[in-house]
């Protein structure tokens, strides 16, 4: 079994963060649930209103962590196109009490 490549999460955040527009672009970074959880632990992401995660390997656990993160409570746009989120993750998002500002969600049917 191949070892998982350790990613420099802080560097990825710095590269993808647009503070002027409060956007975080992490598309095509080969992120999985564990990586997203590390992103959510960073204070740099507090106040982000748009999160672009398309073409990664994020699944239900990553989405549940995102939903539970107080730092993401201002999120208005979330792009999960071409990830591994199933109906279970979408249900967790729908039941979330923290993401009341979310008005745009993009996801694909494939997982």
Question: What is the role of each PLM region?
Answer:
Residues 17-19, 43-46, 70-73, 97-100:
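Inter-repeat linker/turn residues at the boundaries of leucine-rich repeats
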Residues 22-26, 49-53, 75-80, 102-107:
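Conserved hydrophobic beta-strand positions in leucine-rich repeat
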Residues 64-88:
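Charged low-complexity stretches with an acidic bias
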Residues 16, 48-51, 61, 70, ...:
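Compositionally biased, intrinsically disordered low-complexity segments
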Residues 39-42, 66-69, 93:
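Hydrophobic anchor residues at the C-terminal helix/turn of individual leucine-rich repeat
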Residues 1-50:
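N-terminal segments that cap or nucleate solenoid repeat domains
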Residues 3-9, 29-37, 56-64, 84-91, ...:
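Short, solvent-exposed loop/turn at the beta-strand->alpha-helix junction
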């Amino acid at each position: 079994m191949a070892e998982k490549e350790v990613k420099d999460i802080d560097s990825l955040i710095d590269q993808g963060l647009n503070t002027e527009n409060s956007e975080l672009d992490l598309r095509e970074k080969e992120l999985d649930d564990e990586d997203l959880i590390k992103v959510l632990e960073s204070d740099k992401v507090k106040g982000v209103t748009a999160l672009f995660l398309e073409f990664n390997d994020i699944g239900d656990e990553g989405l549940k962590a995102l939903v539970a993160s107080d730092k993401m409570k201002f999120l208005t746009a979330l792009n999960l196109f071409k990830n591994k989120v199933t109906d279970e993750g979408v249900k967790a998002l729908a039941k979330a009490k923290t993401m009341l500002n979310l008005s745009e969600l993009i996801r694909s049917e494939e997982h």
